[in-house]
Amino acid sequence: MEKFVSTMYDAITQGMEKEFPERVAFRYYTEETDTVTTVLFKELAQDVRRTVTYLQSTIPDVKGKKICLLSKNSYEYVVNTFGAIMAGCVLVPMNQRKSWEEMSHELELVEPAAILTDGEDYGNKAQLEAAYGSLLRPMDGFRSYEPAAELHPIGHDDLMVLMFTSGTTGLSKGVMMSERNLLSAGHVLWAISAQLADKIDLTKPLPGHYMVLPMFHLGAFIDLFSTTVMGWPLNLGSDIRNFYCDIQKMPSQIMSVVPMIMNALHKDVMRGHRDRLGDLWVPIGSSAMFDPQVLLDMAHNGMFVIQCYGATETCGAGIINFAQDEKHIGAVGQGSAYMDYKIEPDGELCMRGDCVMMGYYKDPEG
């Protein structure tokens, strides 16, 4: 799009349905049939509308109700994400592999109206069915419904998403995000696009962005919103063990990574196995700090390394580093013109801006 839209309503009605309906929105590979499925933006928009009909017709007074997603990455995950939001629900992406103690704590806190699940057993299926069986629904429930004829804008500053922290300092906290918070992170994608503009052949199809990080991870969640709002294709992976097969079947130039994945890419590059990575040349780091030497090695071997710093509480839009040189590649990067920064006497970096969360759910002192 010519500018990064600020609402999901515009992203769907203007972007997906009018500006780039014939572009590829998603690809995913199915190993059992050895096929790559392609979904266009106009098809995605119709399925989002089906989900709106589905949720609004099966959940009384749906506005503000919590819809939990417990599933591996899939096209249905994407559809339910956008559909729940446009239905006026509060979306709660959850880590399906957490212990039952952690998961039950989060579910009790959220009090969901529905839990959408892929039906697989991640170690807690029996407990989940016993405690919440009446709320469990399949991920593809939307398919038998007609697309909603009308969509309506949601409250720009209303609670839209609850995303749980990793819980490194105890039980996870629910980070409250509004539409303003999440879509304000669009300036990060614009900054990345500007850095890549002179390096991409615009006569060819738009570069594919590969996603294998789970969608309950902030890095993947921001990718989902950013690429679809911009009209870029997203190649979906659901298991890191299928990484090499996925990127050969679905050529991808860009990929968001955490340190473990960056280190694995680094080993391939340094051992002369760059060909295993296909077209991949832009790893975008999010999460913890990366080893500067690893990043420098990648940059010296044709990779363009990007680092994004900013926890879930800032929608990943806190600080970005495009540096490829030895002096600066180990830094966190530069601040954004869209944010205010302050360093406290004890060294803590404080940030203020539209991307900063609304607060912690049911924990105002957190």
Locate predicted features.
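Conserved AMP-binding A3 loop
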Residues: 38-42, 160-187
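N-lobe entry segment of adenylate-forming
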Residues: 1-58, 63, 108
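Conserved ATP/PPi-binding loop(s) of AMP-dependent carboxylate-activating enzymes
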Residues: 334-337, 344-366
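Conserved AMP-binding/adenylate-forming
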Residues: 35-39, 52-98
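Conserved pre-ATP/AMP-binding loop-to-beta segment of ANL
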Residues: 21-24, 146-164, 170-171, 199-208
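Conserved AMP-binding/adenylation subdomain of ANL enzymes
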Residues: 183-208, 212-272
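Structural core segment of the AMP-binding/adenylate-forming
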Residues: 82, 86-155
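Gly/Ser/Thr-rich phosphate-binding loop
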Residues: 253-257, 266-327, 340
